[in-house]
Amino acid sequence: KESYNLRVPEILTASSTRAALERRSFSELREALALSHARLARLWPALTPLERAACWRLLPAGCVAAAAKALSASARWEAYQASSIDCLAPYLEDAPLGARKYFRAPTRREAALLRAGIPK
C-alpha cells in the first residue's frame, strides 16, 4: 500500500484521507485536519458519507467554526447528523482501544452553528 504523510497540509487529499482512515491513523488525520481545516470543505464532495463524518468528528474544537462556515448548507446538515459516535462504528470496530478519544462530539454551540441557515 502507498504511504501518505498527512502532516503536510498540502497533501491532505481524498486519497490520503481515505488511506489514513483505513489504517486507523486517527491521530495523524486529526493533526492534518487541524493544520488545514479549510481544505475539508474542498474535500467534502470527494469523500464518502462515512469518511465525511469521521473527518468532521476529528476536527479539533478550535477549527469547527471556520470549517463549518466553509461548508454548504447541505454539507453542514450532513456534519450535524454525524454527531452520534454510532455513525462511526465501522471505523471503531477494529480500531485500537481508546480510539474513540480522537472523535469529539459537537458542543451545543457547534451544533447550533451547523444548523444555522438550514430551514426547519
Residue ranges of predicted features:
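Hydrophobic packing positions in regular secondary-structure scaffolds
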Residues: 1-120
